Regions:
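Acidic (Asp/Glu)-rich catalytic clusters
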Residues: 24-25, 70-79, 101, 105-112
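Hydrophobic residues within beta-strands of alpha/beta enzymes
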Residues: 31, 82, 112-114
């Protein structure tokens, strides 16, 4: 069985490199880091899209860029797979994203897993769609 572990790496959590080394040492198959680069100042979508959810936790605003964090982890580990869980592709420039994906994959010797998605925050999705159309 392959088991993975995910955290929201921020300046207030365990260092991503320390996390990756520990997970690798414990035999986990992969680590997954999310992406939350755009937090609207005015949000009506409840956290996680769930009606009645509490306010958005502060760590969302402090989340490290997954490609930078995973690149650091790639340099510090040898076997654990490194993944985005998830990369919000609709919010990103496709050329920069392709370069970042290729870079982390090359620096990790093919250990990168590219998890993608759209996310749950409707305000972000609306803005991204307007900008790209």
């Amino acid at each position: 069985m392959k088991i993975a572990v995910e955290i929201f790496p921020t300046d207030q959590t365990i260092n991503p490199v320390e996390f990756a080394r520990t997970a690798e040492g414990l035999g986990f198959e992969s680590i997954w880091f999310p992406e939350h680069s755009h937090i609207p100042t005015s949000r009506t979508t409840p956290w996680g899209g769930n009606v009645g959810a509490p306010p958005l936790p502060e760590f969302y605003r402090r989340t490290f860029d997954p490609f930078v964090a995973l690149g650091a982890c790639a340099a510090a580990t040898t076997t654990i797979k490194l993944a985005t869980g998830i990369c919000l592709v609709a919010q990103r420039d496709p050329i920069h994203t392709a370069k970042e994906v290729a870079s982390v994959d090359a620096l990790s010797n093919g250990r990168f897993l590219f998890g993608i998605g759209y996310g749950w925050n409707k305000e972000i999705g609306r803005a991204s769609c307007r900008e790209r159309v």
